[in-house]
């Protein structure tokens, strides 16, 4: 399909990486494997809500607002309708191991859960995990981005790999890590 205009440079870089692996394989006989992971999250992520991806940004925003007054409202971009797929980094590590052991092909492999959630559902889960009790609202003057991003993961599943960490479990463990490393120094706008 067509590339999302807000993300086309990143998509082109991914395509270039796939082509490079294929060229190394053909020219040098190097068994390069190109993996295309979905949205990743987990320990050591970037939690700066101004520059991070949506999941760690939401953890940062809601956690950073726990001590605010009852009148504080967290503002979230868009309307919450876009759908995204998320994969915990530990599941990606297992997928890499599986592919190194069991894959000899030259086509790229999508790595994900094959399941998506709306950004609204993601926010509701994070609100519950963090224990945020104040209001939040959607700022529809901000962009939604691509309506839906979910990968076809049939190829990696045919190798016997399946993700083990549910989205909620992953958010819970990521939030525990986040609190343990004291990311409370991040400030809200």
Task: Show which residues each predicted segment covers.
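Catalytic helix-loop patch of NAD(P)-dependent Rossmann-fold dehydrogenases
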Residues: 1-34, 39-41, 45-50
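Short acidic-hydrophobic sequence patches enriched in Asp/Glu that either
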Residues: 50, 54, 118
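Catalytic Tyr-X3-Lys helix of short-chain dehydrogenase/reductase
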Residues: 21-26, 62-63, 187
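Conserved sequence/active-site signature of Rossmann-fold short-chain dehydrogenase/reductase
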Residues: 40-42, 54-55, 92
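Hydrophobic alpha-helical segments, especially transmembrane helices
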Residues: 15, 26, 62, 149-150
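C-terminal substrate-binding subdomain of Rossmann-fold SDR/epimerase-dehydratase oxidoreductases
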Residues: 58, 64-186
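Conserved active-site helix of classical SDR/Rossmann-fold NAD(P)-dependent CH-OH oxidoreductases
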Residues: 15-22, 56-60, 93-94
């Amino acid at each position: 399909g067509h590339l999302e205009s807000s993300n086309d440079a990143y998509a082109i870089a991914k395509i270039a990486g796939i082509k490079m692996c294929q060229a190394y394989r053909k020219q040098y006989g190097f068994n390069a494997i190109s993996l295309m992971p979905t949205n990743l999250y987990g320990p050591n992520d970037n939690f700066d809500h101004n520059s991070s991806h949506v999941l760690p940004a939401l953890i940062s925003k809601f956690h950073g607002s726990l001590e605010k007054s009852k009148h504080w409202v967290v503002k979230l971009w868009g309307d919450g309708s876009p759908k995204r797929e998320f994969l915990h980094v530990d599941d990606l590590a297992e997928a890499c191991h599986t592919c190194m052991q069991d894959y000899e092909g030259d086509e790229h492999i999508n790595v994900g859960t094959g399941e998506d959630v709306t950004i609204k559902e993601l926010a509701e889960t994070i609100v519950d995990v963090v224990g945020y009790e104040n209001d939040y609202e959607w700022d529809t003057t901000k962009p939604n981005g691509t309506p839906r991003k979910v990968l076809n993961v049939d190829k990696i599943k045919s190798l016997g790999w399946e993700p083990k960490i549910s989205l909620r479990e992953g958010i819970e463990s990521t939030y525990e890590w986040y609190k343990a490393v004291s990311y409370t120094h991040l400030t809200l706008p």
